[in-house]
Amino acid sequence: MYLGVTRFVTGLTKKVVFADRIGVAVNAVFAAPAAYNGLSIAMAVVGYSLQIYCDFSGYSDMAIGIAAIWDFDLGKNFNLPYLAENPSDFWRRWHISLSSWFRDYVYIPLGGSRRGKLRTYVNLFITMVLSGLWHGANATYLVWGAYHGLGCVIHRLLGKRGSQKTPWQTALCTAANCLFVSAGWVIFRADSMAQAMAVFCGLFRGDGICYINVFVVIYGLVIALTLLYARFRLDGNAPTARLALDTFRGKLLLCVWVFLIAMLMYCGNSAFIYANF
């Protein structure tokens, strides 16, 4: 039960403390991208990548935690997706339950990778387009699915299987994939392709409102909370977590944790992003 409660609280923290607070700044920029400068828009793009991860993984953690309390194992739904080195690896880590379903009931029945390279590329692309349409009958979701489908196909074409990467190459691939995924989230987040293009064009704008101070405060608090979370090691190792709280340093860190949460929870909460899907 302890692990289930811990998982639930972790998910609730991701949603209420992280996702909702980041969303305040992100929503303001996406509502009027023409009013903000390029750096503010770039911070909003990064912010939405964090927001949707904290929102949806938090939602999943809460469900997994509740199930664990009743001694049910729902399995992992996210596996550090932003550490993926390529689009295909990203989809093996993001929304694992949905990705597995599309693999088993769409990609493999279409022939998977068993009917030659060209058919493999077509099957990949079709699967990703359908996964985009699963989110809604909107042009942005269709384009988003096609965007990821094209990314997976290009990776298949250019990627070298079995090749060993140096740490620098791994870091570079991870950073490049994060940029690729973040650009895709702009299309996913936008109400229309026109709004998505306005955000992309705004990245190169030098004038406009500078919203950096708000992002710096929010991101700083989020990073501080994340570091404190790592310090408590609330990852299922219950004895370590309890031992940490028994020390003066543990009590002090807990007070700081509560203070930072109070700093972030200055406005109302919003609905889960994936509640619409």
What kind of feature is each model-predicted range?
Residues 1-276:
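Membrane-embedded transmembrane alpha-helical bundles that form the catalytic cores
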